[in-house]
């Protein structure tokens, strides 16, 4: 992975990418199955980078909060691994699904064990793990405080309207939870696990805040500003591996091919990207492609990675 000698050009690269994205008209379609997300202006675009030497660089609408949705699953996985360790992998797999993120088909064939922690079923199991010994409100608070701690920003909130919108329309997620409960892979009532799930998906963050929160994954598990160890270096690598192979649902292979870094997307249009040893990246453009990933966000990260010669596959 290239070192930071190229990073002085990073602010220029971000500005160039943001300017190019502003000119594009093929922006994808905003998610409408969660009604609150359908109200977001598709013309928005923001991008941020936080380097391991402490610089915070932004362009476009990088300080406007958006619903991080499935990007939150990176942080809930981190918390759950801290709570139960590798026992977590007895209840959720580590393989790409090859199916839509809310598919119920594989659960039937695989006895209620979700393929990975980033598809909806897997994230519901992670929420169930975080419920152990807690009321839903306590588990939700723990997740929010953890993300605030990582970002060093206690202004990050949960958008209650988005959470309510998800609960009111989340019939497929209720089906997934009940199906896993029937296999014994939920230890709490489905509605409790789903309450945690809907609320952590409704966390609102800006690109700047999100890139700050992801710093530890780019720095061997440590907060580069304080040296505080969030996770071990090995666990940071493994979370990064999950992001690379499963972070974009059934578009994960294409993202790895085109961009070449670990990333996690959300249907709110955000993507968290990790350049190990260099920087944490966040991009937001609400319009989605056919796989439910940010269309311009993916294009922007591909362009940025090419400009900066970033890839985990580079010598």
Curated annotation (Swiss-Prot):
* Pfam families according to UniProt: Glutaminase
Class in the EC hierarchy, top level = hydrolase
Reactions catalysed according to its record: L-glutamine + H2O = L-glutamate + NH4(+)
Gene Ontology molecular function terms on file: glutaminase activity
Q: Which keywords does this Swiss-Prot/TrEMBL entry list?
A: Hydrolase
EC number of this enzyme: 3.5.1.2
Highest rank taxon of the organism: Bacteria
GO biological-process terms attached to the record: glutamate biosynthetic process; glutamine catabolic process
**Binding-site positions, substrate:** 70, 120, 166, 173, 197, 249, 267
Q: Which InterPro entries does the protein's record reference?
A: Beta-lactam/transpept-like, Glutaminase
Q: Which family does it belong to?
A: Belongs to the glutaminase family.
Self-association state and partner proteins as the record states: Homotetramer.
The protein, known as = Glutaminase
Organism lineage string: Bacteria, Pseudomonadati, Pseudomonadota, Alphaproteobacteria, Hyphomicrobiales
């Amino acid at each position: 992975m290239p070192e930071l000698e190229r990073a002085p050009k990073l602010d220029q690269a971000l500005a160039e990418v943001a300017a190019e994205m502003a000119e594009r008209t093929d922006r994808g379609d905003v998610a409408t199955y969660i009604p609150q997300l359908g109200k977001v202006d598709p013309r928005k675009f923001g991008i941020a980078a936080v380097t391991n030497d402490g610089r915070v660089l932004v362009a476009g609408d990088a300080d406007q909060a958006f619903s991080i949705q499935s990007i939150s699953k990176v942080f809930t996985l981190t918390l759950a691994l801290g709570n139960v360790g590798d026992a977590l992998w007895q209840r959720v797999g580590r393989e790409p699904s090859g199916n839509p993120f809310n598919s119920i088909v594989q659960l039937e064939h695989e006895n209620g064990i979700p393929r990975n922690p980033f598809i909806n079923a897997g994230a519901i199991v992670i929420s169930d793990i975080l419920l152990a010994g807690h009321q839903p409100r306590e588990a939700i608070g723990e997740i929010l405080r953890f993300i605030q701690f990582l970002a060093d920003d206690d202004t990050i909130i949960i958008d209650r309207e988005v959470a309510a919108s998800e609960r009111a329309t989340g019939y497929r997620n209720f089906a997934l939870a009940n199906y896993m409960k029937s296999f014994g892979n939920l230890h709490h009532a489905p509605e409790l696990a789903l309450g945690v799930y809907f609320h952590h998906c409704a966390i609102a963050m800006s690109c700047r805040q999100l890139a700050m929160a992801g710093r530890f994954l780019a720095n061997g598990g440590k907060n580069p500003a304080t040296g505080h160890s969030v996770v071990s270096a090995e666990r940071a690598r493994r979370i990064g591996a999950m992001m690379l192979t499963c972070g974009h649902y059934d578009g994960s292979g294409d993202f790895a091919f085109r961009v070449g870094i670990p990333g996690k997307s959300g249907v709110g249009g955000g993507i968290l990207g990790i350049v190990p040893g260099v920087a944490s990246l966040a991009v937001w453009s609400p319009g989605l492609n056919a796989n439910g990933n940010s269309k311009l966000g993916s294009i922007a990260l591909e362009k940025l990675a090419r400009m900066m010669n970033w890839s985990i596959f580079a010598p």
